[in-house]
Design a protein with these regions (language model features):
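A short acidic, glycine/proline-enriched capping/turn motif at secondary-structure boundaries
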Residues: 61-62, 83-87, 99, 107-110, ...
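Active-site-proximal loop->helix
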Residues: 88-101, 106, 114-119
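Short coil/turn connectors at secondary-structure junctions
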Residues: 48-50, 73-76, 96-99, 123-127
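A glycine-/small-polar-enriched, mobile loop at the entrance of the PLP active site in fold-type I
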Residues: 1-56
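Conserved beta-loop-alpha segment that forms the PLP phosphate-binding cup at the N-terminus of a helix
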Residues: 49-78, 82, 86-90
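Active-site phosphate-binding strand-loop segment of PLP-dependent enzymes
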Residues: 111-143
Length: 143
């Protein structure tokens, strides 16, 4: 079976075989070494010298982590949304007390940068901009 969705995905046999081995201690030196090797490789892929974080959650969990670690209740933010997961950014930010200006663009299209730019220029109190890079619900990527 070959599914054309974000997940689950077909897993190659060699990966399944590797996964059948014993678990490693996620607080031990073997895991620490694995994590550092992985983040070093991710830095190369993303062409950065900055920190790279591996988050063991769904995409929604990563969105929530981004919000709770950067915003405070009452902060004004803009969310430019083009789909279901973009809308989720608004929901999560509002749950944590942010004042969200939601710019909704047609599903299946990228955000309009002129509209976003105008919104930012019109309100100096905006602390953050939220954009879903790859909107899974429509398959559109905001560049």
């Amino acid at each position: 079976m070959n599914l054309r969705i974000p997940g689950p995905i077909p897993v190659p046999d060699d990966i399944l075989e590797e996964m059948s081995g014993p678990m490693i201690n996620h607080r031990g030196p073997e895991y620490k070494d694995l994590l550092f090797r992985t983040t070093d490789r991710l830095k190369q892929i993303f062409e950065t010298t900055g920190d790279v974080w591996v988050i063991t959650s769904s995409g929604s969990g990563a969105m929530e982590a981004a919000i709770v670690n950067t915003l405070s209740p009452g902060d004004k933010v803009v969310n430019a949304t083009i789909g279901v997961f973009g809308n989720r950014f608004t929901d999560i930010a509002e749950i944590y007390g942010a004042e969200v200006i939601t710019l909704s663009f047609p599903f299946g299209e990228v955000i309009d940068l002129d509209t976003l730019r105008d919104t930012l220029n019109d309100d100096p109190d905006i602390k953050a901009v939220m954009v879903t890079h790859n909107e899974t619900s429509t398959g559109v990527t905001n560049d």
